Amino acid sequence: MVSSVGAASEVQLYLETGRVKVKNQGKVRFLSHSDPLNPLIVELELGEQVLTGKNTRARIEMREKEEEIRLRVDTLFKVNSLDLDQTEVEMPTGKARFKIKRKLNRKKKQRRKFNVRTVTALVGVRGTEFVMGTS
């Protein structure tokens, strides 16, 4: 899904240590890195799935660091949409720590929505920092 705001430069994967698999429409990339002080930074496209491996430390930053997700080991994660009024991500399995800075949309005078879709639920986030796990 491509949105009016969503661009490849708006979603970055920071791989500090370990391995991740990035998959998009049949294309697979394997990334590994071992320097936590200088993370490997990879631009992600909307719809790309990220699967973290064992002993992996990785985070995803969106909207110029307004939305940060720290992925734990064995987590499958995907950014579905980045629209002007909402962000939707998907986490079928795994665990992650979310940190969301909810800025006011000046045109609509409301805060941008942040939704997390799991296998069993769609969660609308109202808080700013939380941990979520699913299996």
Which sequence ranges carry the predicted segments?
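Flexible, surface-exposed loop/linker segments and immediately adjacent secondary-structure boundaries
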Residues: 2-135
